[in-house]
A protein has these predicted regions:
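A beta-rich soluble binding module of mature secreted/lumenal proteins
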Residues: 1-159
């Protein structure tokens, strides 16, 4: 029998993601700080569909300040079968792949919340560099309900 604790710990994804609508540029609004993003400002991610069975991922940021030197990395995202396109594995360095789960997505694809089943990784992305404060707080509340430690969230400076 499942306990309330084990149910609360199971991370759910959205049922379906239309990758054509998802493709394009996203702005990082907030995230759990990661070593590989240290010193990043104005962080963006751009997803492009390919005919090769994966999505290209290009992450960019300005290092050390909003006007700092731009840094970027390219990778590939592979969709997990039978996930409704909501679970991907992202690879920036072969052979390593990281889980990329879409756990919340606006109906109009204006924002997305990406997490990892271990709840140590979290990103809130938007199609615009700024997000309405009320919407942001609602997202934070829902993220907390999903079992993420929201005290770790850091907002991302955007121009």
């Amino acid at each position: 029998m499942a306990t309330a604790t084990s149910i609360a710990q199971t991370l759910q994804t959205v049922p379906y993601v239309d990758l054509k609508k998802y493709a394009g540029k996203w702005y990082e609004i907030a995230s759990f700080p990661q070593l590989f993003q240290k010193g990043c400002h104005c962080t963006t991610a751009e997803y492009t569909l390919t005919d090769k069975g994966y999505v290209t991922v290009e992450n960019r940021c300005n290092k050390d300040s909003i006007n700092g030197k731009q840094s970027y990395i390219k990778g590939k995202a592979f969709v997990d079968e039978n996930s409704g396109n909501a679970k991907l594995k992202v690879q920036f360095f072969w052979p390593f792949k990281g889980k990329y789960w879409i756990i919340e997505l606006a109906d109009d694809y204006s924002y997305v919340v990406i997490g990892h089943p271990n709840k140590k990784y979290l990103w809130i992305l938007s199609r615009t560099p700024k997000m309405d404060g009320t919407l942001y707080q609602q997202i934070i509340s829902r993220t907390k309900e999903k079992g993420f430690d929201v005290s770790k969230i850091k907002t991302t400076q955007q121009k």
